[in-house]
Design a protein with these regions (language model features):
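Short glycine/serine/threonine-rich phosphate/pyrophosphate-binding segments
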Residues: 87-96, 100-101, 108-109, 115-118, ...
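Phosphate/diphosphate-binding glycine-rich loops and adjacent basic-rich segments that engage nucleotide
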Residues: 144-195
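Active-site cofactor/substrate anionic-group-binding motifs, chiefly glycine-
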Residues: 49-110, 114
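Short beta-strand segments
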Residues: 109, 143, 151-154, 184, ...
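Well-ordered secondary-structure scaffolds
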Residues: 5, 10, 15-18, 28, ...
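Alpha-helix C-terminal capping segments
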Residues: 47, 93-107, 187-192, 224-228, ...
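N-terminal glycine-rich anion-binding loops that anchor highly charged ligand groups
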Residues: 1, 10-73
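A glycine-rich helix N-cap at a beta->alpha junction
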Residues: 123-149, 219-225, 229
Length: 440
């Protein structure tokens, strides 16, 4: 079949068959279909959309373009979790060991951060000695032993997605729900878990800025997962303001350990528990209510924290920093930011705060940028809090005063202080299952 004919069919709103989509993906990965033709197809998809059947078929073809991870060597049902990305979003470090401590199996392949959103692999590499690149055999062995292992993504996981994403990035076709959904889910399907929980963020620090768009993306991804035979559920969670208080790699690890020891901030604890209870529900550990009680108990009895420490030791990491965060390498410069006015914090732009952390050295401006694991910021005040002019609302951590001053300017632009108490916002907006959306 000719690519020209497929482009023409989609341009006129036609539905591509699974065979046509597979031929297209295989031809593009093999270099037989040029970028200019694939660019035309991407734009046709952007304008005309795709049916659920098309999107699922495209995703499966992308997942089949590289390695498929066979997790059958791991006993029991495996559950994966994916976040669409946010600021201060360290929930994998919390919900994965909770699920493992409750008898679930989490074989997690995570990515690095780029732009204003952080990556789980970068956070874990802030732990001295922690290895994110280990053999498949060791990966499986650790999951069988302690229920969880988190490693970096394989270089050959869904290579079609890597190639298509690079093209979407330069052809203004990133913001297409079928293309976003197939990009995310192709990697999830290739990663091999039986069940998938999706954390779809919405708000200023998220890719999907509106609730309706976030729900539409979640519905599409859930339909793909279910269509590919994976039990899939999505939660829509808030990312209008950062999650928790710490932003930056070692700072986020330390805060995650606070949550696992029952001492973490309410927002981060609650979102992590809701994610964990749904992961446990997906692998059949009980009703949502029963799974919630199990998750809470794993924090109360210390088993979730000890599970995380065991995983870290098995992957070469020093768990002393998990027990005492002062043992992490410390930033050379600390800078306090004061409110400068009396009132209430009425806006805390998560995207700008994420960009602040990048300027401080905690994130990447390009994929090859080095990371300062000690850099970042701690928020002492959050959205809705009352402040006086002299209150310290954040502390910045970085390697130089120059970086700190540049970041401080950006941070101040992210904060709005008003005279009225702002309306409260839910942490979780909705739960999306196959053919069902429950709004909270």
């Amino acid at each position: 079949m000719r690519m020209y004919d497929l482009i023409t069919k989609k341009k006129h709103g036609g539905e591509l068959t699974a065979e046509e989509l597979r031929s297209m993906v295989e031809g593009y990965v093999a270099g037989e279909i040029p970028d200019y033709q694939m660019s035309a197809m991407l734009m046709a998809i952007w304008f005309c959309g795709m049916t659920a059947e098309e999107t699922t078929a495209l995703t499966i073809a992308m997942a089949d373009s590289g390695d498929r991870v066979d997790l059958s060597a791991i006993a029991g049902k495996k559950v994966d979790k994916h976040s669409t990305g946010g600021v201060g979003d360290k929930t994998t470090l919390i919900c994965a060991p909770i699920v493992a401590a409750c008898g679930g199996r989490v074989a997690k392949m995570s990515g690095r951060g780029l732009g204003h959103t952080g990556g789980t692999v970068d956070k874990l590499e802030a732990i001295p000695g922690y290895e994110t690149a280990i053999s498949r055999e060791k990966f499986f062995s650790i999951v069988n032993e302690c229920g969880v292992s988190v490693i970096g993504q394989s270089g050959n996981l869904a290579p079609a997605d890597k190639k298509l994403y690079a093209l979407r990035d330069v052809t203004a076709t990133v913001d297409s729900i079928p293309l976003i959904a197939s990009s995310i889910m192709s990697k999830k399907l290739a990663a091999g878990s039986d069940c998938i929980l999706l954390d779809v963020k919405t708000g200023s620090g998220a890719f999907m800025k509106t609730l309706d768009d976030a729900i539409a993306l979640a519905q599409t991804m859930v339909a793909i997962g279910e269509g590919a035979g994976r039990r899939t559920v999505a939660l829509i969670t808030d990312m209008d303001t950062p999650l928790g208080h710490g932003i930056g790699n070692s700072l986020e690890v330390a805060e995650s350990m606070d949550v696992l020891r029952g001492k973490g901030p309410h927002d981060l604890t609650e979102v992590s528990l809701q994610l964990a209870e749904n992961m446990l529900y997906l692998v059949g550990k009980g009703t949502i209510e029963e799974c919630r009680r199990m998750a809470e108990q794993s924090i109360a009895d210390g088993s979730a924290f000890e599970t995380f420490c065991t995983m870290v030791r098995r992957q070469g990491g020093d768990d002393a920093v998990l027990r005492d965060a002062s043992k992490f390498p410390q930033a050379a410069v600390q800078m306090e930011i004061r409110a400068g006015a009396d009132g209430y914090i009425t806006a805390m732009d998560a995207e700008k705060i994420g960009e602040t952390s990048v300027v401080l050295g905690a994130g990447r401006e390009t994929k090859d940028s080095p990371i300062d694991f000690a850099a970042g910021l701690i928020l002492h005040k959050k959205y809705g809090d009352a402040v006086t002019s002299d209150d310290v609302i954040a502390t910045l951590y970085t390697e130089s005063t120059q970086r700190g001053e540049s970041a401080a300017q950006l941070f101040r632009a992210a904060i709005t202080i008003g005279k009225e108490v702002p309306p409260s916002r839910p942490l979780v907006y909705a739960r999306v299952e196959k053919d069902k959306v429950v709004r909270y």
